[in-house]
Amino acid sequence: MSTLLNSVLSMASPESSPRKAVGFVSHIPSGFLHFSSVSKGVARVLASTQITLSPKDSAFTITGSSWKPDLDSGSFSDDPRSDEPNLSDSFSHLESLVTGGHKPNVAHSTQLLYDLCKANRLKKAIRVIELMVSSGIIPDASAYTYLVNQLCKRGNVGYAMQLVEKMEDHGYPSNTVTYNALVRGLCMLGSLNQSLQFVERLMQKGLAPNAFTYSFLLEAAYKERGTDEAVKLLDEIIVKGGEPNLVSYNVLLTGFCKEGRTDDAMALFRELPAKGFKANVVSYNILLRCLCCDGRWEEANSLLAEMDGGDRAPSVVTYNILINSLAFHGRTEQALQVLKEMSKGNHQFRVTATSYNPVIARLCKEGKVDLVVKCLDEMIYRRCKPNEGTYNAIGSLCEHNSKVQEAFYIIQSLSNKQKCCTHDFYKSVITSLCRKGNTFAAFQLLYEMTRCGFDPDAHTYSALIRGLCLEGMFTGAMEVLSIMEESENCKPTVDNFNAMILGLCKIRRTDLAMEVFEMMVEKKRMPNETTYAILVEGIAHEDELELAKEVLDELRLRKVIGQNAVDRIVMQFNLD
């Protein structure tokens, strides 16, 4: 373990600037990859598919249009969809009923649709709607809209539009709420022009956009073209008879603040009454965050004085803005005073770790260990449970070379005070640090933990590998795998290799991921469905969509990847 820690600490030290991948990664010229090397790797992948997967093997889910894998779980094999067999049985039963000419139960079918959406099995959810319609059942409007919304949230706007068109062809008109989901989906994809054209078509159909429609368009406008263009768009909407609400103006306030145009935001804020709107707590919070960030404390105080009740009474968000800003500017005493005021007076908000973490982070950055301990003791006394942000704040003590042991003692003390299982608590801390890209602190604390008897398991090593990959230190991640291989107690598992493969696929180095895959097979680690799903998604992520489809079809025929995973990948990358 000490060999591992020493070898990786030297690479992960924040003093070695700039951070970049070295070793086998750095020897490959930029842009070297591509179709040929991936194609060669594909042959090796297909050659490995000699064993049929058991139904228990889980598929790794990559959701969102920007291809963001879910790294929140501790292990790639953890599958939140523990009831998938029941869903499959229920779906098969529904299909049998309808094909047999029977009408299914509306409530049961609707619940199945919701459950499939929650399990990210959207293609089957669409099929449920189709089966209901073909059997003469009118789908519940809220369930139908929910499915459209889920498709759009995951970037599958094309599928959502096709579904809406099919439903309309069958005589099921959509309402503004459903269309708003489509507008929002298009806006999320950065397609403002397409969104505007879509809204025009809706108006020609006789559907009137509402204030939420305008808010989605305005947000897309300031993100794509700047806030001035968003203001022009709002003016056009009003000229055409549109009636925006306060949410629309709050969007513009946010746009000005994100562009650092605090004075313009304040000017618009003061114009709200003349436009027929009374600012609410959201409006005030937007301005307050901007003023505090700029250190304009007198103006912030004046704004706070106006928040005297009703819709503009301070919220827990208001207090957290103040605490975060004060701590950021080094005013920790004032931040702590605001913390105390949160639970006094008429409001008495419940304090959480989110409120304490900025103060702890600042104190750790300044190396004030005694005050950190005092603050954490106060948290525990107030039954405020530390979270991932707390651990990362404490991890920043490791930036002071002389404070590493103090950081460990604080972590150790937190474990004892919360009466946690030490092994599980340490594992959680390391995972939290790695997830946020604080791998250097993770290794330093891990070294102290092992000196006190902590024995890292495969889960912990996967967290380290993912953390190193997240920070671009692939040689370090490979070193972890190599040292695990030499260890007698903790050989690398399939999950460890999957973590490495995923890290390479995320930076469009699927060729190198194929090499790690080959190493995995050579070392007798049998790939699972997760492994193959990551590789196919990696190929698709490099825009080699035809190759990805061919590989996916072949893997499905060889029964090493299940239909649920196939449906998910096909929808994600439009491989139909």
Swiss-Prot record:
Name of the protein this chain belongs to: Pentatricopeptide repeat-containing protein At1g79080, chloroplastic
Q: Which family does it belong to?
A: Belongs to the PPR family. P subfamily.
- NCBIfam families membership: PPR
Note the InterPro entries from the entry.
Pentatricopeptide_rpt (IPR002885), PPR-containing_protein (IPR050667), TPR-like_helical_dom_sf (IPR011990)
Family annotation (SUPFAM superfamilies) = HCP-like
Q: Which UniProt keywords apply?
A: Chloroplast, Plastid, Repeat, Transit peptide
GO function terms (MF aspect): mRNA binding
Q: Where are the PPR repeats?
A: 105-139, 140-174, 175-209, 210-244, 245-279, 280-314, 315-349, 352-386, 387-417, 422-456, 457-487, 493-527, 528-562
Question: What is an example of a Pfam family matching this protein?
Answer: PPR
**The keyword Plastid is annotated on this UniProt entry:** yes
Transit peptide boundaries: 1-37
Q: Main site of residence?
A: plastid
Name the GO cellular-component terms. chloroplast
Q: Which domain of life is it from?
A: Eukaryota
Any idea where this protein resides?
Answer: Plastid, Chloroplast
UniProt entry tagged with the keyword Transit peptide: yes
